[in-house]
A protein has these predicted regions:
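N-terminal targeting/export leaders
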Residues: 1-138
Length: 138
């Protein structure tokens, strides 16, 4: 009985570090009174768990000829840092899984339209995005 109590207490303590908050958000164009108050262009699913995050994003329309979509996590209002999550596949999907020291500092998921085989590490203009909700934005 004592061992079971110890396991329950340890399990409770370790749960204190667990942060979860799966969210599915619409990807919208910039505009309106909000950062992304325009037309719906796709969706993004974010599944954070402690120091890992899985992201699946889908764009409803293809990029322009000679262009490709790229996904980013952005720390808007903080460091202004943008982390590239890579290029969307030809079917319009981005599938990202990674370990991060603090994924919750990011406040937006954005999509840019980049030249195909782009060598510039900076992002082009944002074509769609979403404001992240808690536990993000900490």
């Amino acid at each position: 009985m004592t061992m079971l109590g110890l396991v329950l207490v340890m399990g409770t303590l370790s749960m204190g570090n667990f942060v979860s908050g799966q969210q599915t958000l619409d990807l919208k164009t910039p505009g309106g009174n909000e950062a992304f108050g325009g037309d719906n262009k796709g969706s993004v699913l974010l599944v954070p768990k402690e120091h890992s995050v899985n992201i699946v994003a889908n764009m409803d329309t293809p990029p322009k000829e000679g262009k490709t979509f790229e996904g980013w996590l952005a720390d808007v209002g903080g460091s202004a840092y943008k982390l590239s999550l890579g290029e969307f596949s030809k079917n319009g999907t981005l599938d990202y899984a990674g370990m991060m020291v603090n994924p919750y500092t990011y406040t937006q998921f954005v999509v840019t339209e980049e030249p195909f085989e782009d060598t510039d590490p900076n992002g082009a203009s944002v074509v769609a995005g979403a404001e992240l909700v808690s536990p993000f934005g900490q």
